[in-house]
């Protein structure tokens, strides 16, 4: 009975969520697009001509938002974007124009090599301007185990960023307040000159979800 009430409450909140309605109206696959939009408007992350990698991309709303931004550039011609987008997820994702998508597990060496090869090809040198990560582990409800999983995913995103970001590039990841959060912040501070937490309005108040932004590598690769 309690589970039923929880499901009904979630469904009611979801149906009446203004960001869900806005996403449906504007053609985004998920309300998550507005989390990135708000952070981008505050921090000016996405600019014409950039090479951007979207980790944990499915169902694709972040890639959709990035694509729309790059398509709006005055230099974008013949319906193409001014820049390049590479997206990856373990789950399938319906195709998005101008987005190169890899379905596979980011943690597997073969998939990781494929990602690196595509990044090298689209960037002309292997360096990217922005890495986005909306990756999150399957949570078990055991705080210590979930914290370890979240920290591991954050480490993977940071390792990729350290190897592939331009010196002035940026990394934005999703994480959660609670056990392990301070360790992720400290990891960011070791690698980035500027570190800033972000809690966009589209991120539900009840959720411990937050985002962490790192800019300008301290030790460029």
UniProtKB/Swiss-Prot annotation:
Segments traversing the membrane: none
Keyword Aminoacyl-tRNA synthetase present in the record's keywords: the answer is no
A single cellular component GO annotation: cytoplasm
The catalytic activity of this protein is classed by the Enzyme Commission as 2.1.1.166
Gene Ontology molecular function, alphabetical: rRNA (uridine-2'-O-)-methyltransferase activity
First-listed, main subcellular location of the protein, grouped into a coarse class: cytoplasm
Which residues are involved in binding S-adenosyl-L-methionine?
60, 62, 89, 105, 134
Q: Which InterPro entries match?
A: RNA_methyltr_RlmE (IPR050082), RNA_MeTrfase_FtsJ_dom (IPR002877), rRNA-MeTfrase_E (IPR015507), SAM-dependent_MTases_sf (IPR029063)
| Ranges where the record places region Disordered | 199-221
Q: Where is the active site?
A: 174 (proton acceptor)
Protein family membership: Belongs to the class I-like SAM-binding methyltransferase superfamily. RNA methyltransferase RlmE family.
Per the entry, what this protein does is: Specifically methylates the uridine in position 2552 of 23S rRNA at the 2'-O position of the ribose in the fully assembled 50S ribosomal subunit.
Tell me which HAMAP family the record gives.
RNA_methyltr_E (MF_01547)
Q: By what name is this protein known?
A: Ribosomal RNA large subunit methyltransferase E
Q: What is the lineage of its organism?
A: Bacteria, Pseudomonadati, Pseudomonadota, Betaproteobacteria, Burkholderiales
Q: Which gene encodes it?
A: rlmE
């Amino acid at each position: 009975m309690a589970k039923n009430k929880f499901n009904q409450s979630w469904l009611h909140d979801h149906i009446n969520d203004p960001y869900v309605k806005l996403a449906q109206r504007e053609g985004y696959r998920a309300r998550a697009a507005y989390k990135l939009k708000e952070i981008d408007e505050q921090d000016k992350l996405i600019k014409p001509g950039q090479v951007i990698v979207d980790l944990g991309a499915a169902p694709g709303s972040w890639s959709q938002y990035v694509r729309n931004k790059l398509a709006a550039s005055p230099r974008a011609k013949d319906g193409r974007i001014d820049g390049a987008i590479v997206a990856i997820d373990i789950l399938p994702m319906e195709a998005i124009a101008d987005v190169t998508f890899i379905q596979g597990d980011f943690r597997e060496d073969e998939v990781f090599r494929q990602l690196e090869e595509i990044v090298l090809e689209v960037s002309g040198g292997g360096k990217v301007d922005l890495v986005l990560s909306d990756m999150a582990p399957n949570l078990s409800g055991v705080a210590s185990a979930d914290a370890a999983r979240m920290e591991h995913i954050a480490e993977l995103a940071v390792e990729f960023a350290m190897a592939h970001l331009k010196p002035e590039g940026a990394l934005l990841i999703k994480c959660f307040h609670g056990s392990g959060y301070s360790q992720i912040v400290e990891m960011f501070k070791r690698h980035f000159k500027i570190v800033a937490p972000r809690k966009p309005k589209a991120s539900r108040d009840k959720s411990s979800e937050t985002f962490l932004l790192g800019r300008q590598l301290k030790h460029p690769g």
